[in-house]
Regions:
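Intrinsically disordered, low-complexity regulatory regions
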Residues: 1-97
Length: 97
């Protein structure tokens, strides 16, 4: 598998996870962003920070209470970053950012 194919496969996995979580939880990321108005970006940073700290704990060998690997955490972190970019793009399109 080439690097491009591997990259595409990982992004497809992230997209699949995004769709499944949106089905289960609704569009909670966007809803939370909207609820906090001008602090939407702060809420996103808080969620990203939570994942970052989970990643730090996993790299230190701390046993997680939930079955989440370093790979899973990195994929979640990537998805949160993409969701943040999507919200920023919406705000820019609406002239708010």
């Amino acid at each position: 598998m080439t690097e491009s194919e591997q990259f595409k496969q990982i992004v497809c996995t992230m997209y699949d996870t995004f769709c499944k979580k949106n089905h289960d939880y609704g569009n909670s990321f966007s809803t939370t962003w909207q609820e906090f108005g001008s602090l939407g970006l702060v809420t996103a940073v808080a969620q990203i920070s939570h994942k970052y700290h989970r990643l730090l704990n996993l790299t230190k060998g701390t046993q997680p209470k939930v079955d989440e690997s370093i790979r899973d955490t990195l994929l979640d972190l990537s998805n949160y970053c993409i969701l943040t970019v999507m919200e920023l793009d919406k705000e820019k399109a609406e002239g708010r950012f």
